[in-house]
Amino acid sequence: MKRISIWLIAIILSAVAGIFAVQIASAPSPEEIQITDTPVSNDGNCAYMWAYHNAPELTEKLSATFLAIDPVITVRAEYFGEDCVYADGHSTFGAMETDFYIRIPVDDLTNEEALGNWMSQVLPVIVQLPREEIQGKYGFVEFTFEKTETDRAIVRVPIQLYINSNGITGAKLFQMFHNFP
């Protein structure tokens, strides 16, 4: 009885495999794709590319503000967005967010309280900028605390998360964003 059932299973599997083989062999072949050269017109289509653009007026304004707080702080503002690059080479820029880069020389990279206090001095200045000076949405503030050229800590703070943090300062502020993904 066992032999008959084994033979029966083998015959059924062979029949099913044969049916699939016939279907595949008799399937119509795909149409051949023909490529033709067509002239490209500059009808407004463009290729989008991620881009950063300096914000010199905003950088200058913030530099003057931070000079009054502490002359060791350096700042740079940039707009992040997309360049729409046309076939003829010209491009237009659309800002998606405004980002800020802050460099502060420090003596001790392990003093989280002091680093957080630096952050709590700088962040309110950024948040209080008139909304019309910010292109796109709030981006981030990237702090580079620099002891030497190679010994530094970089902390990136998403501005909206800072706004939602309800006035945290000092070590808690630093720790909140130091290992933030």
Model-identified regions with their sequence ranges:
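Hydrophobic alpha-helical membrane-insertion segments, chiefly the h-region
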Residues: S14-I24
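N-terminal Sec-pathway targeting helices
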Residues: M1-I12
